Amino acid sequence: MTPLLELKDIRRSYPAGDEQVEVLKGISLDIYAGEMVAIVGASGSGKSTLMNILGCLDKATSGTYRVAGQDVATLDADALAQLRREHFGFIFQRYHLLSHLTAEQNVEVPAVYAGLERKQRLLRAQELLQRLGLEDRTEYYPAQLSGGQQQRVSIARALMNGGQVILADEPTGALDSHSGEEVMAILHQLRDRGHTVIIVTHDPQVAAQAERVIEIRDGEIVRNPPAIEKVNVTGGTEPVVNTVSGWRQFVSGFNEALTMAWRALAANKMRTLLTMLGIIIGIASVVSIVVVGDAAKQMVLADIRSIGTNTIDVYPGKDFGDDDPQYQQALKYDDLIAIQKQPWVASATPAVSQNLRLRYNNVDVAASANGVSGDYFNVYGMTFSEGNTFNQEQLNGRAQVVVLDSNTRRQLFPHKADVVGEVILVGNMPARVIGVAEEKQSMFGSSKVLRVWLPYSTMSGRVMGQSWLNSITVRVKEGFDSAEAEQQLTRLLSLRHGKKDFFTWNMDGVLKTVEKTTRTLQLFLTLVAVISLVVGGIGVMNIMLVSVTERTREIGIRMAVGARASDVLQQFLIEAVLVCLVGGALGITLSLLIAFTLQLFLPGWEIGFSPLALLLAFLCSTVTGILFGWLPARNAARLDPVDALARE
């Protein structure tokens, strides 16, 4: 009869400083299907090391070990995990149940790594627990179960994938005598069902219940009676076979990994929340700065547009502050007419201004009087609360009419409901009020100077008595480049004057400068916020590294029941990403709350969230989870299962 487990000259040594300590010294052993074997020996005899090699948790330094004729030395880590998953079931002295899972969920774990569908897995777990007398304890956590009940859950887990070979390490060592007898009775039943049962113990009474007792001392077998030949041995229940297609198996495996990650995080709620806090603050900072910064930029640009966008101002002289008399009369009315004829000009308004006194009854105030055309108010985005602007007839006839700003109206007519038609003195000239213009509120504040507007012809001819203009404002048509229009305007006036005795000021240039400045400032603030996100990511990595250390034994348990290194890597990586994703969602929620609060206090601001910004936030949190979760996950996947199981 061919042995199920065959060991030939197995040696296992470990480094101890500069030397090698040999724990197993040429072990040769055959174990047949259906046997109940006890391996006994004192502490330090090498029996646990032998069990680890038998269960494919450890590899021999030299020698040959075959499982059902297959040489274990030729298998890689994933193939060894498959071998453990399909052939072996482990029963540990300390049960090694996962504390955050129920009895039923603990039993399901091996089948999760076997890729069994959830429904089949659940039915099998319930069936095994019922067979072991725990049908009313399926939803209990390990802490709610007695030692004997926990060991029965451990046995059910060992049988989940078939458990052709049951490896029991001191199965009664942590139990009272009654519970120990129950566990041994179950092991006898498993032997009777065809399972191969290997018990590692130092208790002679437990060993005596086996059909064959193998004694090991100082790494050598000192007693190995011949196996009792068995007939009609089925080799235990057949291994669980996964018939699910590759794609469905991948999706199912990912969903299970996600579920396990969520359970692990939920088991330490406070720590998970504190870990998320860095991500929450980081994402909220990034999103808030981007969104609020964009709203502030739009507000600034709107203020600049309210002054007049796509406009070019022309002034006499070389530059601002130039009061040279030879340039004072550089701009003429003929220049205005020539400019208005250009194809790229939407409108052009002249401006002549002077500080004058305004009088109405016994009220006397100082104001800036400006001579303009009717287009002036459209150019600067001004609206009328009362009346209207000048018409062409009033411009041509030098009509004695005036438009007030809202501050002037309040000073001159504090108690009048309608001021259109009232007559005031502008300097010494009577003028009838035809409108009240409302200037757009600016975040830069309003001017303290009272302002009134008259037709430029009236201002020049009747008030100031001058034939030249103080400035000309040109509005460029939509679709024309403002910089190109400025160059053409400069060429036109230079040709007309025979020299360049004027200078221009392009509002579009100011707009671009402000856009660049706000974009730079927003980028700087975003980088500061990203730093907080990186700090949050480092916090996630730190906690995950601590988690790997704390859960080392859990990792060992998962590997013992058949988890591959990639399964462990996936689980811890998903945990890190899950922390960051949930933190990202909470961070976005916090940023929405911040935006809503700001909207209440700053009603003029238009704060909005684009789908792209939200998508980028989620992408950012996912990338953070992957980047900062990779190192802890890799460390977890690289753990040796024997060392992991031995860790307390």
UniProtKB/Swiss-Prot annotation:
Transmembrane segments: 273-293, 523-543, 576-596, 611-631
UniProt-listed GO biological process terms: polymyxin transport; response to antibiotic; xenobiotic detoxification by transmembrane export across the plasma membrane
Variant or mutagenesis effect after changing D169N: Lack of activity
Swiss-Prot/TrEMBL keywords: Antibiotic resistance, ATP-binding, Cell inner membrane, Cell membrane, Membrane, Nucleotide-binding, Translocase, Transmembrane, Transmembrane helix, Transport
PROSITE patterns: ABC_TRANSPORTER_1, ABC_TRANSPORTER_2, MACB
Gene3D superfamilies registered for this protein in UniProt: P-loop containing nucleotide triphosphate hydrolases (3.40.50.300)
Activity-regulation annotation: ATPase activity is stimulated by interaction with MacA and inhibited by vanadate.
One MF annotation (Gene Ontology) recorded for this entry: ATP binding
Compartments where located: Cell inner membrane
Consequence of substituting K47L: Lack of activity
Record's bilayer topology term: Multi-pass membrane protein
A single cellular component GO annotation: membrane
Alphabetized InterPro entries for the sequence: AAA+_ATPase, ABC3_permease_C, ABC_transporter-like_ATP-bd, ABC_transporter-like_CS, MacB-like_ATP-bd, MacB_PCD, Macrolide_Exporter_MacB, P-loop_NTPase
Role description: Part of the tripartite efflux system MacAB-TolC. MacB is a non-canonical ABC transporter that contains transmembrane domains (TMD), which form a pore in the inner membrane, and an ATP-binding domain (NBD), which is responsible for energy generation. When overexpressed, the system confers resistance against macrolides composed of 14- and 15-membered lactones but no or weak resistance against 16-membered ones. In addition, the system could also transport R-LPS or a similar glycolipid.
Subunit structure: Homodimer. Part of the tripartite efflux system MacAB-TolC, which is composed of an inner membrane transporter, MacB, a periplasmic membrane fusion protein, MacA, and an outer membrane component, TolC. The complex forms a large protein conduit and can translocate molecules across both the inner and outer membranes. Interacts with MacA.
NCBIfam families reported in the protein's UniProt record: PRK10535.1
Similarity comment: Belongs to the ABC transporter superfamily. Macrolide exporter (TC 3.A.1.122) family.
Protein name in the entry: Macrolide export ATP-binding/permease protein MacB
Native organism: Escherichia coli (strain K12)
Higher taxonomy: Bacteria, Pseudomonadati, Pseudomonadota, Gammaproteobacteria, Enterobacterales
